[in-house]
Design a protein with these regions (language model features):
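Membrane-helix interfacial "entry" motifs
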Residues: 1-6, 10, 192, 196-200
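Extreme N-terminal signal-anchor transmembrane helix of membrane signaling/transducer proteins, especially
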Residues: 4-31, 204
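Juxtamembrane membrane-water interface segments immediately C-terminal to a transmembrane helix
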Residues: 30-53
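Extracytoplasmic ligand-binding sensor domains of the Cache superfamily
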Residues: 50-57, 61, 65-151
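The canonical Cys-X-X-Cys-His
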Residues: 149-171
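Membrane-interface helix-start motif
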Residues: 165-175, 190-204
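Extended, hydrophilic extramembrane loops/domains of integral membrane proteins
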Residues: 173-184
């Protein structure tokens, strides 16, 4: 009788330990998968950001040749070209790419709440990217915002003297190289291998 009682206790204890081990394993596996999902989404967003940035840089680099070929200002600027490329790409995919500024010249470039937090982080000067998972209805999306800084080629339109009209007809902001020009937000579809976690925001 005593032996039977001990056997029951042993099997009960073994069962409890097995359940605990299984729970720990599932928690670890879930966490590892979540980290991998984040890593994969972030890597994809960084590649897209670099590609659209390369298009911006290319138009900026060939701007003098474009103007010389036409004999006058062509109206094809880095910002105009990059925005058009972003719109064309976004229209034919589940992704969204656009450009924002804290003081936009165009209302369509105004940031939303998430993007304003990103711009604030950039202004503090400690991060160059801001990203996180966001639930929208029944689905989730990965949001990434990359910093855009004023470079030498930006100064004819955004540099000194502040208030003077640039070639596009807008008033210059009097900005200098290294200032925060704005940001490039990306919205990527989220397809995790496991159910998503609660939203987690990150800045780097």
């Amino acid at each position: 009788m005593e032996r039977r009682r001990l056997a029951k206790k042993f099997f009960l204890l073994a069962g409890v330990v097995s359940v605990l081990v299984l729970c720990v394993y599932l928690a670890w596996f879930y966490h590892a998968q979540s980290i991998e999902n984040d890593r994969r989404a972030l890597a994809e967003a960084r590649v897209l950001s670099a590609e659209i940035g390369a298009a911006w840089d290319y138009i900026d680099a060939v701007q003098p040749q474009i103007n010389r070929a036409t004999g006058e200002t062509s109206g094809i600027y880095c910002a105009v070209a990059a925005k058009d490329i972003a719109k064309r790409f976004s229209a034919g995919s589940a992704y969204s790419i656009r450009y924002i500024r804290g003081n936009p010249r165009n209302t369509e470039d105004a940031p939303d709440d998430f993007e304003r937090k990103a711009l604030s982080s950039f202004e503090e000067g400690v991060v160059e990217e801001y990203y996180g998972l966001e639930h929208q209805g029944d689905s989730s999306v990965f949001r990434y915002v990359g910093l855009l800084e004023i470079e030498d080629g930006c100064l004819p339109c955004h540099g000194d003297p502040a208030g003077e009209k640039d070639i596009t007809g807008y008033a210059k902001e009097g900005m200098a190289e290294g200032d925060v020009a704005g940001a490039c937000p990306l919205l990527c579809p989220w397809i995790p291998s496991l159910p998503t976690r609660r939203p987690i925001w990150s800045a780097r």
